């Protein structure tokens, strides 16, 4: 689940970051403000919003999707959507300042020499934002691994199907017995270790000028 969430955030994070920085259009400021919405509302609210839209026959789109055999709520797709939504701003907020900093001079020069938009992005823009993108992806991964509220609402916590590591921690911690407590703390420690290790590795690999 975390893998798919990070993949979605990588693609959408770059695209949404470019829109308000490189293009002028009505509603550009509104888009910039909406980027922070997932950080401003409770993850529980995010989960309830997804229920409102995709829940079975009562959701706005749930009945239509179920008619074609696609289940969103209480299934992996809903969990991926919830996790991607709450962690997307972490990617965008790393990339946007770098795009402002590098400006558009090199991109305009490349286009004046005949480079296509795709070539310009691949050879100029992407290399310039690569460390910001990587750091944002790592933050997104850490957030995805630790997400609890939104996932709990949309997943149902079905063991071996929609139960994430964070939901397992909660379930085992609330159960009696030394073994369950040890399992809960072990899973929590592993999640925290993965997040910390990923951040340390990326920070260590960053060029010194990128760290300043």
What name fits each language-model region?
Residues 28, 47-84, 118, 155-158:
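Membrane-interfacial helix termini and adjacent extracytoplasmic/periplasmic loops
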